[in-house]
């Protein structure tokens, strides 16, 4: 028997007879041995008390036979159930999440669709306390709402800067999916300025692959420092299953709406009085523009702020209040958080020449031709 055959025979014998061999131990790679493993636990411990569970009860108009899924506002918003035989008043109980943004005064940010039509709102803190909440204000176009509780010992989250986010940044979602309290999932920023899901809404979503499910609505999307960068609001799915495409409202948008809701109880949007189309490559070529950018004015309301400022159909708006307008979505969002009476500068191109105009926003409604995106001035919503 050659040495190789002898070695094989010895191995077979050992396996068959159960002769003990030297124990094997899992070992850490040399690069991490003796050093702490990376963990998000300290950040989560800091942020988690600022995330709350929100349960609501109310009555809404429903169609057709009773379906428990249709009592979930998240489901109804994104996975519309089949139409039934007619509307009827239906009591509902639903759940979502929220984020404490002001510990002193008890203000909590959440989604509008979490508290819409609610007659009773209950906030459950991480420490188990159940608190009655009142609705401060709701803004359906941005899907943002603010509720308030009267309590001591609250923990508020630190507001970050969503304009500094970049694709590839790590983010963490915290909420109460399916009633599982303070569930934490992680991922990255998969995309920015996502829009086009609804022609009637303000859309400037952060896209993330951090898992978002029913009950996460209104919860926190934070960066690795624990700063709030978004309010989780939706997923993209044909079946209702999470496929790794979730969306959050940027905190810059949420904070702007929040301030107006707290101060005024509603968002008083200034109107410009124009309807615009996106500048496509074909439109840019026909207008002699170097690139497809800006919002092409399709129509101006007579007597509107735009009309008084001298804007005309065919003008291309390139900036509002110093903010570049690369698309009609940018224009809509730029105007969407300005108030009645605000004066804004409008940079535009007319016959290939750059001009600047000033307009004082009013509450004038804009025309909305078929296919046009009129922006907030045409009462488009998120």
List where the protein language model places each region.
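Serine-dependent protease modules
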Residues: 25-309, 319-345, 349-356, 360-381
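Sec-dependent N-terminal signal peptides
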Residues: 2-17
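N-terminal leader/targeting signatures
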Residues: 9, 21, 74-75
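Conserved catalytic motifs of ABC-family nucleotide-binding domains
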Residues: 314
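C-terminal segment of classical bacterial N-terminal signal peptides
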Residues: 15-25
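Protein maturation boundaries and topogenic segments
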Residues: 1-2, 298
